[in-house]
């Protein structure tokens, strides 16, 4: 039976990088790793409404000796940094982040614009999950997302939805693919993400692969 590798992990150090960048001693590694986990869960859960409204694709965490830097990649950065009370938003966010970390450090926050939502599989998977949770028929939801991706100029994509589709008794997989998605080509820039849609019939699993370009 063939084994599948994670498209992102397979390319770490080639055309992908870690979302967390820091070094730690043996004794402090576990504690810092736990802090990273808490920070990411804070953005997803406690900060969830603004997180989704801004279209946050990822949060990079960089650490220096006395500094913690957060790089927030967002499709709509003005939802975070374009308001009249921008400084107040950042001040509140810094205070909440400091509560999650044991060592008091200078916290820097930077918001980075995501140029195209369609190139980020995280945002595509999340948008599809929202449609399915609103009881949109899964074939229609997939078709709408596929049409957006076709217009965006990506070289290829694959979308898969698994579970009790439209309330069927038997769980099954449905998928659609357009163009090329070369998972074994290391120079291929593949954006991969998963999401869950919580429906009245159960949980639907979503997987999205997007082939943006080749990096030589």
From Swiss-Prot:
Residue stretches making up the KH type-2 domain: 43-115
GO molecular function: rRNA binding; structural constituent of ribosome
Annotated GO CC locations: chloroplast; cytosolic small ribosomal subunit
Keyword Ribonucleoprotein part of the UniProt annotation: yes
First and last residue of the signal peptide: none
Protein's UniProt keywords contain Transmembrane helix: no
Cell compartment(s), UniProt: Plastid, Chloroplast
Disulfide bond sites: none
A Pfam family this chain is assigned to: Ribosomal_S3_C
InterPro entries, per database record: KH_dom-like_a/b, KH_sf_prok-type, Ribosomal_S3_C_sf, Ribosomal_uS3_bac-typ, Ribosomal_uS3_C
Keywords, comma-separated and alphabetical: Chloroplast, Plastid, Ribonucleoprotein, Ribosomal protein, RNA-binding, rRNA-binding
GO biological process: translation
HAMAP family xrefs: Ribosomal_uS3_B
Subunit structure and binding partners: Part of the 30S ribosomal subunit.
Protein family per UniProt: Belongs to the universal ribosomal protein uS3 family.
Protein name (record): Small ribosomal subunit protein uS3c
The organism of origin for this protein: Emiliania huxleyi
UniProt gene name: rps3
């Amino acid at each position: 039976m063939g084994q599948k590798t994670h498209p992102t992990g397979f390319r770490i150090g080639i055309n992908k990088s870690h979302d967390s960048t820091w070094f730690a001693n043996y004794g402090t590694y576990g504690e810092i790793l736990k802090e990273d986990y808490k920070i990411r869960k804070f953005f997803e859960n406690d900060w969830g409404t603004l997180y989704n409204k801004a279209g946050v694709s990822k949060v990079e965490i960089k650490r220096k000796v006395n500094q913690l830097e957060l790089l927030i990649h967002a499709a709509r950065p003005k939802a975070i940094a374009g308001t009249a009370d921008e400084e107040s938003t950042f001040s509140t966010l810094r205070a909440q982040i400091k509560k999650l970390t044991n060592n008091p450090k200078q916290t820097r926050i930077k918001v980075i614009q995501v140029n195209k939502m369609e190139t980020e599989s995280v945002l595509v998977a999340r948008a599809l999950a929202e449609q399915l949770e609103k009881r949109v028929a899964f074939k229609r939801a997939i078709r709408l997302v596929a049409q957006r991706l076709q217009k965006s100029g990506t070289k290829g994509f694959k979308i898969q939805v698994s579970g009790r589709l439209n309330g069927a008794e038997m769980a099954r997989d449905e998928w659609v693919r357009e163009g090329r998605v070369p998972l074994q080509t290391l120079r291929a820039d593949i954006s991969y993400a998963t999401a869950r849609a919580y429906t009245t019939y159960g949980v639907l699993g979503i997987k999205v692969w997007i082939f943006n370009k080749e990096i030589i």
